[in-house]
Amino acid sequence: MVYSYTEKKRIRKDFGKRPQVLDVPYLLSIQLDSFQKFIEQDPEGQYGLEAAFRSVFPIQSYSGNSELQYVSYRLGEPVFDVQECQIRGVTYSAPLRVKLRLVIYEREAPEGTVKDIKEQEVYMGEIPLMTDNGTFVINGTERVIVSQLHRSPGVFFDSDKGKTHSSGKVLYNARIIPYRGSWLDFEFDPKDNLFVRIDRRRKLPATIILRALQYTTEQILDLFFEKVIFEIRDNKLQMELVPERLRGETASFDIEANGKVYVEKGRRITARHIRQLEKDDIKHIEVPVEYIAGKVASKDYVDESTGELICAANMELSLDLLAKLSQSGHKRIETLFTNDLDHGPYISETVRIDPTNDRLSALVEIYRMMRPGEPPTREAAESLFENLFFSEDRYDLSAVGRMKFNRSLLRDEIEGSGILSKDDIIDVMKKLIDIRNGKGEVDDIDHLGNRRIRSVGEMAENQFRVGLVRVERAVKERLSLGDLDTLMPQDMINAKPISAAVKEFFGSSQLSQFMDQNNPLSEITHKRRISALGPGGLTRERAGFEVRDVHPTHYGRVCPIETPEGPNIGLINSLSVYAQTNEYGFLETPYRKVTDGVVTDEIHYLSAIEEGNYVIAQANSNLDDEGHFVEDLVTCRSKGESSLFSRDQVDYMDVSTQQVVSVGASLIPFLEHDDANRALMGANMQRQAVPTLRADKPLVGTGMERAVAVDSGVTAVAKRGGTVQYVDASRIVIKVNEDEMYPGEAGIDIYNLTKYTRSNQNTCINQMPCVSLGEPVERGDVLADGPSTDLGELALGQNMRVAFMPWNGYNFEDSILVSERVVQEDRFTTIHIQELACVSRDTKLGPEEITADIPNVGEAALSKLDESGIVYIGAEVTGGDILVGKVTPKGETQLTPEEKLLRAIFGEKASDVKDSSLRVPNGVSGTVIDVQVFTRDGVEKDKRALEIEEMQLKQAKKDLSEELQILEAGLFSRIHAVLVSGGVEAEKLDKLPRDRWLELGLTDEEKQNQLEQLAEQYDELKHEFEKKLEAKRRKITQGDDLAPGVLKIVKVYLAVKRRIQPGDKMAGRHGNKGVISKINPIEDMPYDENGTPVDIVLNPLGVPSRMNIGQILETHLGMAAKGIGDKINAMLKQQQEVAKLREFIQRAYDLGADVRQKVDLNTFSDEEVLRLAENLRKGMPIATPVFDGAKEAEIKELLKLGDLPTSGQITLFDGRTGEQFERSVTVGYMYMLKLNHLVDDKMHARSTGSYSLVTQQPLGGKAQFGGQRFGEMEVWALEAYGAAYTLQEMLTVKSDDVNGRTKMYKNIVDGNHQMEPGMPESFNVLLKEIRSLGINIELEDE
């Protein structure tokens, strides 16, 4: 296996057996590809902005004399880059400019004669852009648009499963769902009549819609029924015989022909009878006259002579009618073929209850149902019906919908129109009737073939289209009204509705969510999330059990494990590792093709529908070297069921064992040994891990850590290979390899690192270089670690030495006992950054002012502020300290003009302003690490703002000039090379100043050309530098665009360092969570024979009942990994020769049966081996992939290699007494996470504080500085104990007795502890409520 330079530094030993056929795809592609499709020019006009424009334009005027046509669009450049947008609190977006053409036609001339054409580029608002990591910056905060799983457009056949009607009869229904437009439902009622509903309105007989489509009763019956033909010959009734139709019926008369009786009266007609009739080719049989009674005529019969209607279509025949028909000369009578078994008379019955009899009455009926109360006119009724399903503006099935529609009706072509046709509606009704007749199955709506993914691009396109449609109306008005000769396209278009629609979607849609930025994993998971909620989706309350459940089609597409606990369970899912969406938006997953029993490396992506036709083997099926299955019978999946198949029946095989699970679940080692519920908690809790001060890679991982760290975008990754030319804490410079350079560039890549920034969850984002000077790097190498990454691998927690044993009740109920050493070594210390903002507004009484001159505040409180009234950077502040001094004018007193004059002269200010400074919230203390001041355009900047500006300018200049120097150096080294090769002596050249080099001339023409080219590049470089510097200066010095009424905003950033402490929540990766109960001194912790104390003591009772055994295997394997690290450490300390070191490390890597990873340390130089050993000192990292991990035997071998007991248990001694514990204890290394549920954020106490206005009771909750609720049940408890005085105190002075509590406060201050309870305010509220009912209730003094 080839390792890149960074990977060589620390290779993870892989226990995976199955070869990696397909690399893990880029994990954010679902977001990036979708948005790319939205903004990129699409000549076909299928997707994105192009599709939206084409669907709305051209817009014609009502008269048809003019139209506005769309030509093309372009997106401009964003004004600010992503970081600037975040700092300034603006949206990262680009202006959209559209080229439109206004065409005016001649009025009198023949149609299509053009009078005038005007073309112009029009601004159409801003389109938010996606950052490289798949997020959007909206108003300065990073947001993610979650993909939605919604019901695919098309037609669905379903049943109520017998739940609607009391008889338990199953009622079938069909529903045509368009991408946009009205829903059309057909449904049976318990009497087997067929009804139609439009948009879930009142139901109408289904034949009304057929009549509205211009069908007559005869045509309707013709469409849905076969005919039975009777002929009257010689006063006898004969019936044309179709033997197949008789099957299963009981003969009501002898069936005979040519003197032979085939079936006797009363006998059941069987397949044998039918075969005989067919064999003898019987075409007609004689039937008794009574047999026709009750049959239904299929068409109108008219008396030719008189023109009188004897029998109408769909009328039941009787013997009288038969006689009349016979008399009027009708000898051939057509009736409908129905029976109770599989040809029900549903449509015939429906026609009977249909009140309409022609097209107009049907349209009127539909109009009345859609618009009750409006008087119908013929035109209104016709246009309403036309617009419902047959107008492209109002109705669209979309390509997906048409494909699903045609597939469902078993048509051959999958393309077609987006609107419905007559045939579409009739075919749906026919299929529904077939299902009712017992032919065909209903659809499964939870099948992933019937649900599709709607991603960012598509949702943004829909919103954009909504905006365009709003504009369309206005444009139509203007085209009809105005004087067109003077108007230009930009006078027609108002960009407001478009930007409003887009802004609303990105800012406040249910699917546009505040990004979860706790750690890199939570970012990636959030972007790969799939929600069934949101506009056009389900709601929590309505979603039943079936929708939430795991479906067989989820395999390899949606993770069966990772979903929230609580009301959203199963509605919010996570995409599986290898899943992707196809062109229609259905999820598909990769499989290896199996040809002639040989598994090939050919990969096919199959959607849920396609998968149903194949037999698919599991990824853990054993193969020989040629790729044949070893076993005769292979475990496979087919049509949603799992069973054994012979090896030559197999069509496909899974790509990887982790194909089933999501990224979060694929990071849990030994997932196969955990109960699913606990694995769910484990996957969810990894997302809540707070990045620790020093990241520590997991000793036991799954091999997915690198993919997650790199794809999440928190690390700095090399764009091109080269060598590290410069590196410090905030920037890395790479000199690019010759072969990767673009022609004519300096070949220098500069990576600026992010330093101590705040994430959405107030955790700290900080990048640190992990390469050193002169190191070679390749494309894709990790150059700098971000939060929670260690040498390019995801590192959410810390490796802890744990023991499973009870310890004095301190680990009762999942509590965790932690050693003091963990605190001392800052293992779980985290940095949290809080942003506090102070806004100075323009009020009615005058502007608020940011100043250090605050009334009634002592010197001490102002000691940390500068002269502008803003806190210094580096100040240590605690709760209640002033960060930004601000005063607000207060205007209770109306001043006389004389007073005003005096005020103006003497500037007596303090009396009319109140202190509204920004203070540190209670319970928070930290260090100020940054201050930003934003000043409105046109408002004078204060001293601090100017200082900050100057600093930023200086920094920008320094950055740019350093960049220029680096690029210049690169360029001059190339100039040097050209000059030397052109014959100039190197020594002389070095004596010349660099800028004079370009003045030299060379005789060789080719070299001279090269030199001139380089000189041009040099000039361009300087010019570019000036331009960049000017742009930066302009951005820094220009005023800020603040909200109306805001003059200034000061943002202060506090860094809070939080050590681990009792009450903090910790967890492993297997759903084993607990709260720290005690931090124990090191000397009291249990220790082993070598005197090494354990770090954490966990309760063994937390394992068996929860069935997450993965944690125990992880503990053992972690111990082995650490043991090997210890041996390497000892060898390094003894300075043993490299050969021995190489041999031992090689043995460790080779251990384990037929593992896929072959590490050959002989290809490593001695230096590389030493560096590797240095990085393995703390333990050899191990990968045990999901469902393909280390076996028990392999763990034992590894323990043996590390000189550790293979039982995984050791003898421990009690730290307090030094006595040995009576049994050996499982001790090992487990990866523990500190979760973002910190006790500091939850601890809260109140003495006095704010009260609710109406009830005068204290508020509740930490945010309001509220009290503890003493509720109804607590009152009962005091009553039960008879604690009368305590109860009285609780209900009066401690709560809402206003006078009593004020007096009480005074008494306590005076040292007098007497209590005088009065009337609780809530009693007055009760009185008022009773009075509001009109009952006068008064309190009388006795």
Curated annotation (Swiss-Prot):
<dbReference type="InterPro" id="IPR007644">
    <property type="entry name" value="RNA_pol_bsu_protrusion"/>
</dbReference>
<dbReference type="GO" id="GO:0032549">
    <property type="term" value="F:ribonucleoside binding"/>
</dbReference>
<dbReference type="InterPro" id="IPR014724">
    <property type="entry name" value="RNA_pol_RPB2_OB-fold"/>
</dbReference>
<dbReference type="GO" id="GO:0003677">
    <property type="term" value="F:DNA binding"/>
</dbReference>
<dbReference type="InterPro" id="IPR042107">
    <property type="entry name" value="DNA-dir_RNA_pol_bsu_ext_1_sf"/>
</dbReference>
<dbReference type="Pfam" id="PF00562">
    <property type="entry name" value="RNA_pol_Rpb2_6"/>
</dbReference>
<dbReference type="InterPro" id="IPR007642">
    <property type="entry name" value="RNA_pol_Rpb2_2"/>
</dbReference>
<keyword id="KW-0240">DNA-directed RNA polymerase</keyword>
<dbReference type="Pfam" id="PF04560">
    <property type="entry name" value="RNA_pol_Rpb2_7"/>
</dbReference>
<comment type="function">
    <text>DNA-dependent RNA polymerase catalyzes the transcription of DNA into RNA using the four ribonucleoside triphosphates as substrates.</text>
</comment>
<keyword id="KW-0804">Transcription</keyword>
<protein>
    <recommendedName>
        <fullName>DNA-directed RNA polymerase subunit beta</fullName>
        <ecNumber>2.7.7.6</ecNumber>
    </recommendedName>
</protein>
<dbReference type="Pfam" id="PF04565">
    <property type="entry name" value="RNA_pol_Rpb2_3"/>
</dbReference>
<dbReference type="InterPro" id="IPR010243">
    <property type="entry name" value="RNA_pol_bsu_bac"/>
</dbReference>
<dbReference type="Pfam" id="PF10385">
    <property type="entry name" value="RNA_pol_Rpb2_45"/>
</dbReference>
<dbReference type="InterPro" id="IPR007120">
    <property type="entry name" value="DNA-dir_RNAP_su2_dom"/>
</dbReference>
<dbReference type="Pfam" id="PF04561">
    <property type="entry name" value="RNA_pol_Rpb2_2"/>
</dbReference>
<dbReference type="GO" id="GO:0006351">
    <property type="term" value="P:DNA-templated transcription"/>
</dbReference>
<comment type="subunit">
    <text>The RNAP catalytic core consists of 2 alpha, 1 beta, 1 beta' and 1 omega subunit. When a sigma factor is associated with the core the holoenzyme is formed, which can initiate transcription.</text>
</comment>
<keyword id="KW-0808">Transferase</keyword>
<dbReference type="GO" id="GO:0003899">
    <property type="term" value="F:DNA-directed RNA polymerase activity"/>
</dbReference>
<keyword id="KW-0548">Nucleotidyltransferase</keyword>
<dbReference type="InterPro" id="IPR007121">
    <property type="entry name" value="RNA_pol_bsu_CS"/>
</dbReference>
<dbReference type="Pfam" id="PF04563">
    <property type="entry name" value="RNA_pol_Rpb2_1"/>
</dbReference>
<dbReference type="InterPro" id="IPR007641">
    <property type="entry name" value="RNA_pol_Rpb2_7"/>
</dbReference>
<dbReference type="InterPro" id="IPR037033">
    <property type="entry name" value="DNA-dir_RNAP_su2_hyb_sf"/>
</dbReference>
<dbReference type="InterPro" id="IPR019462">
    <property type="entry name" value="DNA-dir_RNA_pol_bsu_external_1"/>
</dbReference>
<dbReference type="InterPro" id="IPR007645">
    <property type="entry name" value="RNA_pol_Rpb2_3"/>
</dbReference>
<comment type="similarity">
    <text>Belongs to the RNA polymerase beta chain family.</text>
</comment>
<dbReference type="InterPro" id="IPR015712">
    <property type="entry name" value="DNA-dir_RNA_pol_su2"/>
</dbReference>
<dbReference type="InterPro" id="IPR037034">
    <property type="entry name" value="RNA_pol_Rpb2_2_sf"/>
</dbReference>
<dbReference type="GO" id="GO:0000428">
    <property type="term" value="C:DNA-directed RNA polymerase complex"/>
</dbReference>
